[in-house]
Amino acid sequence: RLKRELVALNVVYDDVNMRHNHAEGQRLLDHLCHLASASDVPMVTQVRVAANIANGIKHAFKEFQASEILMGLHFHKEINRSFWGEFTRSLYNGLSRQIIVTRILQPLNTIRRIQVAIPSRAEFEPGFYRWLERLARMAGNLECRIAFHGRNETLQLVNEFIRNRFPSVR
């Protein structure tokens, strides 16, 4: 159970479309708040106007004293490479916290397997066990299998952690 509320944030550019995008963002957040309350999850929402999206996220992160960021990836057919380069660099440089970027294309309750590619020497990074715990908890809640791919040394640590902390996860 959560001990504090989730924060749902929508950041819109301060441009000529700001009013329209602000209204759309508020409508989206209202829907999200309704879904959260149906699941008995406390949530606060905010539509923030910013000249720089990454800065808008960073400022909200600090104001709400958030512990991590879960960010949805948009569904545009083409993703501009320069957007990801500058945006992620700006966001990562401003925060030393876990940032999860996800693009969920199907309902979560239909997922039967999670495939995880672990970068080389990831076990030496801060937050290694934190994201591992998040994935194991998600696999347990979804009752699906989880498969890890990486170096043997890392996989031994992962398997030991899962076996000791989440014995029901397969």
Question: Where would I find each of the regions flagged by the language model?
Answer:
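Conserved phosphate/pyrophosphate-binding and hydrolysis machinery centered on Walker-type P-loop NTPases
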Residues: 22, 47-51, 81
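Short, internal active-site loops enriched in acidic
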Residues: 13-15, 51-53, 153-155
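Non-transmembrane accessory domains of multi-pass membrane transporters/channels
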Residues: 1-46, 121-126, 130, 135, ...
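Solvent-exposed alpha-helical segments within well-ordered globular domains of core cellular machineries
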Residues: 30-34, 55-62, 89, 133
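Intrinsically disordered or low-complexity boundary/linker segments at protein termini
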Residues: 1, 67-160, 165-169
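Structural beta-alpha unit
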Residues: 38-69, 165-170
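Conserved beta-strand scaffold positions in the cores of enzyme catalytic domains, especially
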Residues: 8, 45-46, 99-101, 170
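Short, surface-exposed amphipathic charged segments that create phosphate/polyanion-binding patches used
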Residues: 24, 59-63, 114-116
